[in-house]
Amino acid sequence: MPIHAAARTQARLPAAVAFVREFPRLLATRIERSASPAARFLDPAAGRGQWCATRFYKLMPLAPEILSELRQRLGADNVLTSQEDLIPYSFDGTAALLQMPGCVVFVTTTEQVADVLRLANRTKTPLVTRGSGTGLSGGSLPVADCIILCTVRMGRILEVDRANLTMLVEPGVTTLAVADAATAVGLFYPPDPGSMKISTIGGNVAENSGGLRGLKYGITRNYVMGLEVVLPDGEVLWTGNKCVKDVAGYSLRDLFIGSEGTLGVVTKVLLKLIPKPAAKKTMVATFNAMDHAAQCVSDIIAAQIIPCTLEFLDRTTIHCVEDYAKVGLPLDCEALLLMETDGHPAAVEDEAAKMAELAKKNGAMAVRVAKNEAEANSLATARRSAFSALARLAPTTILEDATVPRSELAKMIRFVAAVAKKHNLRIGTFGHMGDGNLHPTFLTDERNTAEMARIHEAFKEIFDEAIRLGGTITGEHGVGVAKKDFLPKFAGDAQMRVMRALRGVLDPNRILNPGKMFD
């Protein structure tokens, strides 16, 4: 860093520290002015039923004996308790949800995780596991008086096994680091959530994360071959192995994937890798109607073409992304499809030509082929930046992920637009059109209580319609807090009964991530 830049940074530090220390008071003042019936996140006195919250709870320190034992086992530097240190862990990527934890602890080994869990279980102290905090359903949000178990320092890639096409990692390794390590040895790790630069593998496993390439390559579950998990009582369990085929007993590995930290804490992940595709081709097609884009997607799938990426942006999102990323997206259209095919060079050329032909048949205004790898990457980056681009338009951005069968996609897109008009809401919609996963993104201000109430009604209508069309309330973001009130309607009584029974057996004291998924 240049000396003058360092001096400027040093000069700013006192002001920055003062702001962090003052932040709770400023936030409390804002909330006192804007508190509403929506302020219900994990508040026993307020009841259930609202999606979002604006209340910032006061810090409630854990019992001194618990903190003392944590410091003894982990070291004082690995236990955070001051208010300014806890603020960054009081929220995740979910808009408007806030709660101060009792403390934050950093762990580096499985043994330390087991020690913390034994303590939490013995004292019946709630514990919430956290990676990078990029989740979009409130899955890693604290509850009052809880221990936040942060795994970001468990960040080692332990083994890359080229003979068996596997990689063994700790939960704090970022998704991008896994992908880069695979690429370095000529292999490929396909799952690519939008936050892959900072999201951790542990979080990906907890949420069963998807990504842009999910249509062809699947989601996180398809690439987990084994897990080391610490159970709530501190017992360490290994499930899975490097075998391609293994049908011995229940698939406990699959039980923990997508369980959102409610059944155990993942401490190691054995990942499957695949050969890197030899070639790829990226294209952008623009349409003057969203229905035409949706029909193009249906025709591509009907032609038995499975692209690795088949994404869409609506008009609002296109303009926001271009203003944000400046990659030369066309602005004179209502819908944009980002299409990418990969594999053998001859197959790639054939599929790309067929997709371009189908796009034109469905009224595409233009089909643009990326000229080189750099242009292809910039187009993919533009799509990945959709959420960030939309977030600049309003103080509060709420991203959802209702998912429907591909055959119902056009109906669902029209329904979202109708809901936005009915409730007078601003919504930008983008998502994984190839697998029916929509991301309607609400642009609002959490202080506008009347609009937040309308958004809550809009969510209910969108999720009800997704279920009616044979879809789901979440394709990749998880249930967490944001959608737990919608889960019983989607899952039904029998599934809810089985899930509650499983959770009760593994975690009878209900210490792990309480208040998430279901009560």
Predicted regions located by residue number:
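Short alpha-helix boundary/capping segments
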Residues: M1-A15, R33-P37
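Aromatic (phenylalanine/tyrosine) cluster motif
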Residues: F19, F23, F41, F56-Y57
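N-terminal flexible segment immediately upstream of the FAD-binding catalytic core
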Residues: F56-R118, R122, G135-L165, G194, ...
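Alpha-helix capping/hinge segments and adjacent helical runs
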Residues: G75-A76, I467-V479, P508-L512
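C-terminal substrate-recognition/cap domain of FAD-linked oxidoreductases
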Residues: T81-I87, L271-P275, K281-A458, E465, ...
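FAD-binding subdomain of flavoenzyme oxidoreductases
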Residues: R156-E311
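Activity-critical C-terminal alpha-helical subdomain
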Residues: E235, K484-D519
